[in-house]
Amino acid sequence: MTITKTQRDILGASALRPDGIAKVQGDFSFSSDLHAENMLWGATLRSPHPYARIISVDLSAAWKIAGVECVITADDVPGQLTYGLISEDQPVFAKYFVRYMGEPIAAVAADHPETCRRALAAIQVEYEILEPLTDPERAIDGSHADIHPDGNIIRRQRIVYGDITATAPIVVEGTYDIGMQDQAFLGTESALALPDHDGAGIEVFVATQWLHEDRKQMAKCLGLPEEKVRLVLGGVGGAFGAREDISLQVHTALLALRTKRPVKMQYGREESFFGHVHRHPAQIWMKHHATEDGRIVKIEARMVFDGGAYSSTSSAVLINGVTHTQGPYQCPNAVVDGYATRTNNPPCGAMRGFGVVQACFAHEGQMDKLAAATGIDEVEIRLRNIIHTGDPMITGQVLESVAPVERCIRETAALPMPPEMSSNPHELDLPGGSGLTADRRHIVRGVGWGVSMKNLMYSEGFDDYSTARCTLKNGSVELKFATSEVGQGFVTLAPQIARSILGIDDVTYDTIDTQIGSAGSTSASRQTWMSGGAVDGACRLVRERLFEHVGAVHGIDPLRLGIDDTDIIDTIGNFRISVQEATADLTISETFEYHHRPTEDLDENGQGNCHVAFAFVAHRAVVDVDLELGLVKVVQIATAQDVGRVLNPMSVVGQIEGGIAQGLGLAVMEEIIVKDGKVRNPSFTDYLLPTALDAPQVLISMIEEPDPQAPMGAKGVGEAPCISVTPAIVAAIRNATGKSIDRCPVRPQDICF
């Protein structure tokens, strides 16, 4: 698609990122680049076992190593011993049991990273190795003893809707397995902690998605009032959900407070795999009952999400999964049973798509089975069942969001297909990249579809809000917010909002930290809506006061004033003055807290208005498959996405293309391999990621139907691109091979054998 540049960087323009040039030139300061005078290095000792009782921990040898300044364990935590986003069930340091491979046991601070490594190697831990719980079904059926005082089931949620005895002549069912995906951000976890001179407080620079929630959890563990813990956003090298949970924040701060010196911690790639949560692996069974003309009558489903050792956000991920069972389709009757379990596998939590990725993989596989059973085209079967604004969902909630599902499907279908592979293709166009061993005669093409809906913002009664301040001074504007910039582009959007409302081009933003009210997490596709709403509200308050000032000076009713480009005008008269002139020697500052409409918890039958709003998307995938080698080349992805209103076209395209790449990874290559509770591939050597050679042609149609509930009509676009692209690619592989493949990622052996 073509993106045009407008004259001013206001809403609707493809404004350039303020940090873009620095990042391209290598001048941007990421959190791993931070340094302080007299700084120590910190490091963490981790368990090599997925489940064991700690008999003893001997630190004496570590203390004797020259350069070691501090060694700490659970006994040195001055405040609360556990933390967590929803349930505070995860220890700062394991004291009696380790419940997953990589769980922290101790931390050290020393003069050099190599000294830290020597100190960790010197710590002696005696374990009694226990049988790990690795099968979520054993957590459910009770055949394994509880591995945590809170039990092995984090949450169970049923949905019972309509007539559960309803039947129909066409029945299709399947069991779908979704692998454990890593967020695989390029910038690993890092933080720099600076203790106050009096030891009564601390400042921490950290790459995170939620500054205020980190501060809240840290303060409890440090035994400090929240106002004594200041967090500043360090440059973030990707997030995708993994930075919602605490990782090294408390450890770094504890070491700094104990040594009274700055301490920096930074994970290597392997440690990063153990230091953050991943996407939940899941097994989902679904049965669809439909009429002979393909209309869904009832859905039955059972979902099991493996949450790993601690709860993190598993309960919320489960709710997203079960409430999206139907997908973007009408369903008058449903019975769903969902579990999030504890095991001794790696902890799982937030990742882009947040439970909907797993549900969508299953319901789109079912739609393809339904198409085959009825003899109806894959596109037509979806069109016959699409949900509309005003339709009820299986939770009883009425869909209030603008729901252009039909447009998504039809506009995707209208995008051009790629040309057929030539009889003598370039080797890089063959499955496998270099393709030197590929035989053109064994390569077949397939086409597949995926359609999805994704909730926006937090759900189930969470009091979600965001705060922003706008200060107009001498013809320029400074914005203040705590919105974590993790690459999504809010630092570009916020000034665009201010320019559009105030008619001032000189807009900057202050340090992103906890010196203002919370902005919530940069997740759930919420920041354009929530923090955008806060910036919009603050700027409108400033404009209101500006109009009052101009009206008083020039004798005009403020209600008659408006903004025309960079001028203030009398909307029914001839008065005009530049905003620059009108604001000379003037200071106005306003703070605004934006809340979305309230939601509610689900009841025992899964009924309730638990979500705020939804976005919709369709994907069509074209793949080439080498039947002999089991290799896949994704040739093209076509997509039409419901974006509400496009505020920055270039940013939207970037989000869509990035989401497609992440969904492609889950479809054909990305999976953390866990056996007996142990991660077998904690590196980018063995955990495969899409590269530029794997990137397909991407065709995008942005569907603009502004949502009246949204502050500027815009819906968040971050998560939807990665959800239905995975089932679309897998469907295309099924179409090419004729095999019934109901897992992702698809492995070569799934194709060849």
Show the residue positions of the predicted features.
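Conserved catalytic cysteine-centered active-site region
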Residues: 94-97, 225-227, 231-233, 257-268, ...
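C-terminal catalytic domains of large/alpha subunits in multi-subunit enzymes
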Residues: 74-75, 223-228, 257-263, 292, ...
